[in-house]
C-alpha cells in the first residue's frame, strides 16, 4: 500500500518542511506548528512559532488537510519537564472537547505502555459518546 497520511516526528517540522510534506502528502495527522509570518509572508526566526491543535480536521496555511491529535497522550511518568498524564486525563480532555459541534477526539498511546490503560481510555471516550473510526474515514 502507498502511504496517504503523514505524521511528522514529535509533531514538529520547519515551515519549509511543512510545505514540502504537502507536496507529497495531501493529509497529515498531528498537532502542528504555525510559524510567525506564514500568512503574511514576512520573515520570522526559527523559534517564532506556536503549537496549534484543533477539535476537528482543518486545511492549514501550508496547503495540507490536517487530522488533529488533540487530546494528548497517556504518560504515567514525568518526562521532558511534563507532568504525568493518566488515562482519566485523556478521557477528561475528550469530554471537554464536546463543547464543539462534530468534534474529533484523537490521542496517542505508546505501544510499550500497559494495554489495560489503553482500554480505560477507549472505554471512557466511548462512554462520552464518541465513535472510533480510522483516520482515512476523517478525510
Predicted regions located by residue number:
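Amphipathic alpha-helical segments that form well-ordered structural scaffolds
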Residues: 1, 20, 120-124
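Generic intrinsically disordered, low-complexity segments enriched for polar/acidic and small residues
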Residues: 3, 53, 127-129
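Active-site-adjacent pocket scaffolds in enzyme catalytic domains
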Residues: 7-98
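Short catalytic-loop micro-motif centered on adjacent basic/acidic residues
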Residues: 4-8, 106-109
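C-terminal domain-boundary segment and adjacent tail
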Residues: 25-46, 97-139
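A structural motif corresponding to the C-terminal end of an alpha-helix
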Residues: 1-2, 100
Amino acid at each position: 500500500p502507498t502511504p496517504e497520511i503523514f505524521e511528522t516526528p514529535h509533531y514538529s517540522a520547519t515551515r519549509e518542511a511543512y510545505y514540502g510534506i504537502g507536496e507529497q502528502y495531501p493529509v497529515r495527522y498531528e498537532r502542528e506548528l504555525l510559524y510567525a509570518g506564514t500568512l503574511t509572508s514576512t520573515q520570522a526566526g526559527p523559534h517564532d512559532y506556536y503549537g496549534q491543535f484543533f477539535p476537528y480536521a482543518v486545511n492549514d496555511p501550508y496547503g495540507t488537510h490536517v487530522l488533529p491529535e488533540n487530546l494528548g497522550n497517556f504518560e504515567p511518568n514525568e518526562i521532558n519537564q511534563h507532568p504525568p498524564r493518566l488515562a482519566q486525563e485523556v478521557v477528561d480532555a475528550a469530554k471537554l472537547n464536546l463543547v464543539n459541534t462534530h468534534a474529533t477526539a484523537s490521542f496517542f498511546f505508546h505501544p510499550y505502555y500497559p494495554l489495560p490503560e489503553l482500554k480505560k481510555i477507549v472505554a471512557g471516550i466511548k462512554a462520552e459518546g464518541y465513535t472510533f473510526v480510522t483516520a482515512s474515514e476523517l478525510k
